[in-house]
Amino acid sequence: DEQKADLKFFQEVKGGKALLCWIIQDLGDQLTPKGLNATQYWVEEKGQGNFIEGVKAYANAICDSIEKYNLDGFDIDYEPGYGHSGTLANYQTISPSGNNKMQVFIETLSARLRPAGRMLVMDGQPDLLSTETSKLVDHYIYQAYWESSTSSVIYKINKPNLDDWERKTIITVEFEQGWKTGGITYYTSVRPELNSMEGNQILDYATLDLPSGKRIGGIGTYHMEYDYPNDPPYKWLRKALYFGNQVYPGKFD
């Protein structure tokens, strides 16, 4: 009950969004009942022997959980290039003629979540989305943890083939290790004045302007709760928001 109250306060008073998230690698990840084989449960039982129907059932089960717990959407953590390929995730472009299994998975999630005002985002390798499929996703989140300069970040995220990529792209800093220093300590910002400051990685991300002149869609941290013990609590997130909105306001149109 306390967690439900916290969630309600976060959503209704603070205006926050809480998304369900896990790595999507194999059919049934996180939701296959204990003791049951994923293929038997999702393909044979739920899909009546059809793998694609099993994918639809899996996506709908995720949506059922989101609705049950009053969450705001789903974050597809998609990392086939980082050791997480499987029966759903692979190196193919996600499209009807490429990785059609993920195509159907995303189509099903999008059709359930977005009309209801919920979000569907992809992090990890959103660059594997086809142009048409990217229209079904609200945000592309890149784990830009170890990029050491503004130019290397822009190189990583510059994907004009993705729908509205400038406004929909979010870049994140790694805080399991970098929570004390606002990210890596060997980062070089295109803004010289930031390079003399501690935390120049997260401050650069918060003020990052794309080649068109538009501001990056958003920023984040992996394990934001690690920023809480800093003084003041959430020191780096607060400072990043201040720099991005007040010190270097951006162009969003």
Give the role of each language-model region.
Residues 1-200, 214-216, 225, 229-232, ...:
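Chitinase-like catalytic core of GlcNAc-active glycosidases
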Residues 206, 212-220:
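Cysteine-clustered segments with highest specificity for TGF-beta superfamily mature ligands
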Residues 221-253:
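Extracellular low-complexity, O-glycosylation-prone Ser/Thr/Pro/Gly-rich "stalks"
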